[in-house]
């Protein structure tokens, strides 16, 4: 068993010139601090001792690291007078896919000028993310939890490969809810839901909709058009979906079964209403008095 050596700030530091730092916007500076503190926390979780220097305190407090008359990342602790040397620092380079938009937040590869040798595998690691991943792998720790399936993972710095399992074949992802879609057209729909945008407006009543298909369906309520007719009873519907749902009542099909009572329903609306009764949920609230109801029909 190898003893864990003491790690100083120099071992996990990232170096920029003053000119490079000045060119960074607020989001990139925040990203820098987050990456630095994350590297430190990973090493602490693995049992390494981190000497808490003035710089780390500055990072934790979110303070500016450049100060007039001082070099970038120079430790101002009186016990340590020498500035951190460039040869022992880590450079941060952006890695952006060729097909990625320019506005995409950059991912980071922290490259060591002096390779680190893993005691367990004997491999030389040149990236700080590789070092931490190597240490996590040998320790058996899995501190990252997948949002999609709850699976524990050892790779905290690069959870994307696992994430791709859940989004396989779906390359368009909403940056607000993380839901993935197979094409960009389908991605636009949830974005409108988040933003509240309703670009399709009825010229008769001025009611607005997020989708063109919803507008066309609404316009039929003004014209009275019901093109979908049941061959058995003659009842007509605005949408083909409503006709198919109605036809199930003639066939006696009941596709929706309640897990609690075992009761079956031919329509999803009836199934949802039954489920609300079991849960006690009252999602329909009166805007005037605030009283809530389980069913929308009770509210009306």
Curated annotation (Swiss-Prot):
It comes from the Eukaryota. The keyword Cell cycle does not apply. Residues 7-78 form the KRAB domain. GO terms for biological process: regulation of transcription by RNA polymerase II. SUPFAM superfamilies: beta-beta-alpha zinc fingers (SSF57667), KRAB domain (Kruppel-associated box) (SSF109640). A zinc finger (C2H2-type) spans 172-194, 200-222, 228-250, 256-278. Signal peptide: none annotated. It is found in: Nucleus. One of its GO terms (molecular function) is DNA-binding transcription factor activity, RNA polymerase II-specific. The keyword Metal-binding applies. Keywords: DNA-binding, Metal-binding, Nucleus, Repeat, Transcription, Transcription regulation, Zinc, Zinc-finger. Transmembrane segments: none annotated. It holds the Pfam family KRAB. May be involved in transcriptional regulation. Belongs to the krueppel C2H2-type zinc-finger protein family. This is Putative zinc finger protein 705EP. The gene is ZNF705EP.
């Amino acid at each position: 068993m190898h003893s864990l050596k003491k790690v100083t700030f120099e071992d996990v530091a990232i170096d920029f010139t003053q000119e490079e730092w000045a060119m960074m916007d607020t989001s990139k500076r925040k990203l820098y601090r987050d990456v630095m503190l994350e590297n430190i926390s990973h090493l602490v979780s693995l049992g390494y001792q981190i000497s808490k220097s003035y710089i780390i305190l500055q990072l934790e407090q979110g303070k500016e690291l450049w100060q007039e008359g001082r070099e970038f990342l120079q430790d101002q602790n009186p016990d340590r007078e020498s500035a951190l040397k460039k040869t022992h620092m880590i450079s941060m380079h952006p890695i952006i896919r060729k097909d990625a938009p320019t506005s995409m937040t950059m991912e980071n590869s922290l490259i060591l000028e002096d390779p680190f040798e893993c005691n367990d595998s004997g491999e030389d690691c040149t990236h700080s993310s590789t070092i931490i991943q190597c240490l996590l792998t040998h320790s058996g720790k899995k501190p990252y939890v997948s949002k999609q399936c709850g699976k524990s993972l050892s790779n905290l710095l690069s959870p994307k490969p696992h994430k791709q399992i859940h989004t396989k074949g779906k390359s368009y992802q909403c940056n607000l809810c993380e839901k993935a879609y197979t094409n960009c057209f389908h991605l636009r729909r949830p974005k409108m839901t988040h933003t509240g945008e309703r670009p399709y407006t009825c010229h008769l009543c001025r009611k607005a909709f997020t989708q063109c298909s919803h507008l066309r369906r609404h316009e039929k309520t003004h014209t009275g058009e019901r093109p979908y007719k049941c061959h058995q009873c003659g009842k007509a519907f605005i949408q083909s979906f409503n006709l198919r749902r109605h036809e199930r009542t003639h066939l006696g099909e009941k596709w929706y079964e309640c897990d609690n009572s075992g009761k079956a329903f031919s329509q999803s609306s009836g199934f949802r209403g039954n489920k609300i009764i079991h849960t006690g949920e009252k999602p329909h609230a009166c805007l005037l008095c605030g009283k809530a109801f389980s069913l929308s029909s009770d509210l009306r």
